[in-house]
């Protein structure tokens, strides 16, 4: 793999060490193993972490750049969190997108994801939300290589203030794939393959999406819930709808754009939310998804922008989300 796109495990994991507690004092930095992704099948079951250092898609979408620096800062915030699982984490390194080489970087990221999914689930640390096209492409490649006999029913669940259904090509304007286009790209791919497109977008902001994007979502039968409707008073109804969505799918891909949270909670994002959805209101939906660990194969966290963070609070939020997802994925083995 070209060194231009891939930095092999250069992050140095370190953190607090409580020697008096022995193995019971384990933290993430104690259990994470940096390995070559081609050797993942030789190791015990765990969860793989893969960085995607890229904000070329954000730049193309006319957003605030800075997300390229995020994977290692999420790792740093993750390193000191307590680790209770008997299963390890595997750090596969970071795919780096230099200049505007977005498509090539996405292909490299997808290749790595496809190669490790037969052995372990994957959490990708973005980067802008262009990571979603890389993540899904890797998942799709996995199914094409290992289960070509049947079209997979993949449920895509996106916590996001934006649909990210913008056009990725046009004869009337100079348009390229960006952080605003991944789910339109995914739908186009599914259509070409004859796969159903199951897309849920939770926390979408009516103020941040044009009428054209809402019409596109309706056209594609996207199940969405606006930010203002994710309050606790509506939890039971929307959780039931989420359960129906999950039941209709055989596999789940979870993607979290940190701009779904209020700017006061997540200031370090490419597009801060004036309203957003509180962590407390979002948590029951995340918990419901993680309860279906048998279906959850892939997740990513996107749009952390450390340039605008305050006291690393957005990094800590991203790390906690990663920690929650990784624990659920590792629990899969305990419940088999």
Swiss-Prot record:
It holds the Pfam family Arginase. Binds 2 manganese ions per subunit. Mn(2+) 1 binds at residues 129, 160, 164, 257. Its cofactor is Mn(2+). Gene3D superfamilies: Ureohydrolase domain. InterPro entries: HutG (IPR005923), Ureohydrolase (IPR006035), Ureohydrolase_dom_sf (IPR023696), Ureohydrolase_Mn_BS (IPR020855). One of its GO terms (biological process) is putrescine biosynthetic process from arginine, via agmatine. Keywords: Histidine metabolism, Hydrolase, Manganese, Metal-binding. It is an enzyme of class 3 (hydrolase). GO terms for molecular function: agmatinase activity; formimidoylglutamase activity; manganese ion binding. Its EC number is 3.5.3.8. Pathway: Amino-acid degradation; L-histidine degradation into L-glutamate; L-glutamate from N-formimidoyl-L-glutamate (hydrolase route): step 1/1. It comes from the Bacteria. SUPFAM superfamilies: Arginase/deacetylase. It catalyses: N-formimidoyl-L-glutamate + H2O = formamide + L-glutamate. Catalyzes the conversion of N-formimidoyl-L-glutamate to L-glutamate and formamide. Belongs to the arginase family. This is Formimidoylglutamase. It comes from Vibrio vulnificus (strain CMCP6).
